[in-house]
Curated annotation (Swiss-Prot):
Its EC number is 3.6.1.41. InterPro entries: ApaH (IPR004617), Calcineurin-like_PHP_ApaH (IPR004843), Metallo-depent_PP-like (IPR029052). It is an enzyme of class 3 (hydrolase). It catalyses: P(1),P(4)-bis(5'-adenosyl) tetraphosphate + H2O = 2 ADP + 2 H(+). Keywords: Hydrolase. Hydrolyzes diadenosine 5',5'''-P1,P4-tetraphosphate to yield ADP. PANTHER family: CYTOCHROME C5, PTHR40942. It comes from the Bacteria. This is Bis(5'-nucleosyl)-tetraphosphatase, symmetrical. Belongs to the Ap4A hydrolase family. It comes from Vibrio campbellii (strain ATCC BAA-1116). Signal peptide: none annotated.
């Protein structure tokens, strides 16, 4: 059995299929972990959702910011973004089943050796705090409070963690950390605007979340997507897998057991 972890699909279904063919992926023997943003600007978001759902227990998925936006659109709280190609989902006969399945997915998934999330883990959190905050929000996503959360989650504040945060403030910080974060200010506050590569930003102003000097060390590696400008940052304990397939880059996947990296160039 092999464990494969892949970055943001964003509806690039054909590239995903070619990548899985490269490694002779078998749903009966292997596991596919997907680091969020299954849907959005690629041409086949509907096909991607159907395929990943069909894998059952052979797939491990975490929610990304585009997945949450899809839920908000489905509730009539947001409109489809101009560049998104998710409209076919809303006219699909299995729309309800797909969206229900999506809402059951976590913000944080855990392996014996690593954790996976879409954007990252707050540098001010230890792993237990990350687990607890994820579970709090996941419980709401799976409840009748989902529309309330989706309507109120869009905010850049609070941007600094404090254990005393509660209610909506706590949920917003958690969602922003797991699905939107890239840089932090030197004092640990989250920045929600800059998408540049780290080498183009002064560390006196902004620091990648995983390089903050006061970051709490974690006992497991962190695998994530979201930040295409990192172009597949990989070191021992921090592995970024978004390489911008939807922007004409490539889709990147790592086999955990031997750390071999596989890529598939964008087809369009």
């Amino acid at each position: 059995m092999a464990t494969y972890i892949v970055g943001d699909i964003q509806g690039c279904f054909d590239e995903l299929q070619q990548l899985l063919e490269q490694v002779n992926f078998s749903a009966s023997h292997d596991q596919l972990w997907l680091a969020g943003d299954l849907v959005a600007r690629g041409p086949k978001s509907l096909e991607t959702l159907r395929f990943v759902k069909s894998l059952g227990d052979s797939a491990k998925v975490v929610l990304g910011n585009h997945d949450l936006h899809l839920m908000a659109v489905s509730q009539g709280l947001k409109k489809v973004k101009d560049k998104d190609k998710t409209a076919p989902i809303f006219s699909a006969p299995d729309k309800k089943e797909l969206l229900t399945w999506l809402s059951q997915q976590p913000l944080l998934a855990e392996h014996d050796d690593f954790v996976m999330c879409h954007a990252g883990i707050s540098p001010l959190w230890d792993l237990d705090t990350a687990r607890n905050c994820a579970r709090e929000v996941e419980a709401i996503i799976r409840s009748k409070q989902l529309p309330w959360l989706l309507e109120n989650m869009y905010s850049n504040q609070p941007d600094l963690w404090d254990e005393s945060l509660s209610g909506l403030d706590r949920y917003r910080y958690t969602i922003n950390t797991f699905t939107r974060m890239r840089f932090c200010f030197p004092d640990g506050r989250l920045d929600m605007d800059c998408k540049l590569p780290p080498q183009e930003v002064s560390e006196d102003e902004l620091v990648p979340w995983f390089k903050l000097p006061q970051r709490v060390p974690l006992e497991k590696a962190v695998l994530f997507g979201h930040w295409a400008a990192l172009q597949g940052h990989i070191d021992e304990n921090i592995i970024g897998l978004d390489t911008g397939c939807v922007w004409g880059g490539s889709l990147t996947m790592i086999r955990w057991e031997d750390k071999q990296v596989f890529t598939q160039q964008a087809l369009s």
